[in-house]
Amino acid sequence: MKKAWEAWTNISLVIRILIGLIIGAVLGLVVPQATAIGILGDIFVGALKAIAPLLVFFLVISSLSNATNSHGGVIRTVIILYMFSTFLAAFIAVIASKLFPVEMVLVDAVTDTAAPQGVVEVLKNLPMNVVSNPISSLANANYVGILAWAVLIGLAFKAANDATKKVLNDISMGLSQVVTWIINLAPAGILGLVFTTVSQNGMDIFTSYGKLLLVLVGCMLFIYFVTNPILVFWCIRKNPYPLILKCLKKSAITAFFTRSSAANIPVNMKACEEFGLDKDTYSVTIPLGATINMDGAAITITVMTMATAATLGIGVDIPSAIILSVLAALSACGASGVAGGSLLLIPLACSLFGIPDTTAYQVVAVGFIIGVVQDSVETALNSSSDLLLSAAAEMRQWRLSGKEIKF
């Protein structure tokens, strides 16, 4: 038994995940009634979500309390990349929607959760989350609040003695080890998640909303494989695709199936460590990216709004399209603070064209129907871009300082 386990763990994690994926899909088609299999996925996602807030909190405190150099330049570059790529994603989505207009069959509205009434309300979430109670922030996975308090506490602990700093470092190292153990459970977790998806949804979603999904997923793939490489090349001045593919393998696969940027934070941090990035930097930029780097959300908001306008016969001129891009980018940055995420920001964007809430909520309902694909690809794009842009920004610093870039 021990030899079998060692042989299994010696196989590449990606290969093990693919094996779990295939087994989960087959079981979902053959025995869809065996719902207990899906518990494996729930346990895996729950474990990642549980460890992530603690990992971020102590990693940031430990990094800042022990830091001897300033990393403001790299962090500033990462934030600029996050904001620019989100706007670019919204703008690309507008162009794609104009080139490939989609009309939808609207369904009954989803009205369980109230959508924000304006972009000010959406952006208000960010500063309010900063001053949230730190215990509440940890319990509710409010990463803006966790980051804010961890930064303050970390700076305060810079004056602590070496023994205290060592304890903080030991705690962060211990949590990192727990993350490694959890990530090794990914094959079983992915098996459960894929089983649930296949057994509950089958393949009907692709026939009913195929064209809409093609535009959404096409935009997201374009951002990851065309525009993101341009940003990475600007940073490192060499072929970006080896890094692109490495981030895809390390981050996007798990993010696709967990459908949670928060749950993927430990995965991204582990990848940053393997890339040789500075812990003082990525301990801040990765959780920050899970909050404000929302390329996928910007695409979803834009494409769904443009599809609604096309369905209702509303023309969208160039100035309106640019305004929509800005609005979608700003709204996407606050998506993590809104229940329902990007889908419930669609009514806000629809209001730009005078589309009534009753119709907008029908579009939200369509979003929930296609969510099994849309949300999976969106999360994969968002989370893997956090890793990619964090790595690119630090490697830019390596290039400027004459250090060799390896990945």
For the regions a protein language model found, what residue spans apply to each?
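Membrane-interfacial loop-to-helix junctions in multi-pass transporters
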Residues: L13, L48-A52, N140-V144, V179-N184, ...
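Transmembrane helix boundary and interhelical junction motifs in multipass membrane proteins
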Residues: L55, G189, S260-N268, A298-M304, ...
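Active-site-adjacent helical/loop segments in soluble small-molecule enzymes
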Residues: A50-S62
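Signature of multi-pass transmembrane helix bundles
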Residues: A4-V30, V45-L48, G73-P242, K406-F407
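Helix-loop-helix junctions within the multi-pass membrane cores of secondary transporters/permeases
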Residues: K250-A332, L389, L400-F407
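Juxtamembrane helix-boundary/capping and inter-helix hinge elements in multi-pass membrane proteins
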Residues: L64-G73, A159-A163, N201, R237-P240, ...
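Transmembrane alpha-helical segments and their short flanking loops
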Residues: V303-F407
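Hydrophobic transmembrane alpha-helical segments of multi-pass transport and channel proteins
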Residues: A47, M83-F87, F91, V217-L221, ...
